[in-house]
Amino acid sequence: MLKLLLLVLFMLLGAANAAPPRFAAVLPDERLEFPRDHGAHPDYRTEWWYATGWLSTPDGKPLGFQVTFFRAATEHDRANPSKFAPGQLVIAHAALSDPAEGRLLHDQKAARAGFGLAYAKTGDADVKLENWTFKRQADRAYRTRVEGAEFTLDLLMTPTQAIMAQGEQGFSKKGPHPAQASHYYSEPQMKVSGSVTRRGKPVAVTGTAWLDREWSSSYLDPEAQGWDWTGVNLDDGSALMAFRIRGKDGSVLWSHAALRDSTGRVTNYAADAIAFTPQRSWTSPRTSAAYPVQLAIRTGDIVWQLTPLQDDQELDSRASTGSVYWEGAVTVSRNGQPAGRGYLELTGYLKALKL
């Protein structure tokens, strides 16, 4: 915690004499290009590599996992040649959901990029924060390793399907104004193998993961409170992504959903065809935030029911990104029939999210 506080203090002191940089704008005519867009985009304000999934132990017990690396450009002048200038920050979160524990196990790190200790490289996915790593290998598989205080994840995630460009060929609107957008793509249905270590004992795991890649310079409307998002790997090989951005007045500022079937055909749903309906809430005993952990999401004539693996999947990241949110493994039914498993993210329920 002290290291993080010193880092923030150093940034604020330096910013007093720094010329504010001009961040790159998200433009609708810019197309995704690979492997370039697997890597970092340092000219944009915010970016993340976000992997979630379900794992199974040899005795069949389910686990949920989340590994996220963030890159954030600061207000410091990027033309400053000093190696000590904190122009980029790297932040990481990791979490493990296990009903046997009854709570979310999680950890976090943050550091300014530089000196080989923290970086987010351009050209392909290669992100490091001390001994936490996320890298795309020559065979297209992603390898991530994080060593938390209560657990270690060492996972290999291998794509089995084509990249799913979200929105309009990767241009994803997040509000009515042109600047409120991101470049966004997903890699659903990834095959996972590796190990989870707790209390010094590694256990082999297999499973299925979802990777989200997103970068932006102006993500949220000033009146936004937070968002609800889900990414679901469906049992028939399909993939569902849906989100809504909630206003501070309780309204829905923006929403979008996309369903890609097993043949690769994508159906995009506009706001008038989408509805998020809370079914049950859980109140955190630590923060008193109430989260709608059980949701029904309607996309067109389909109703998806999301049920949490466990209620307590609250992640307190105030020591790194400053936010508290709920992010957890969920089972999913389609019109009342079991259909798949995924992750649900609920932000802005303690206080408005700033991004």
Put a short name on every predicted segment.
Residues 3-14:
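Bacterial N-terminal signal peptides
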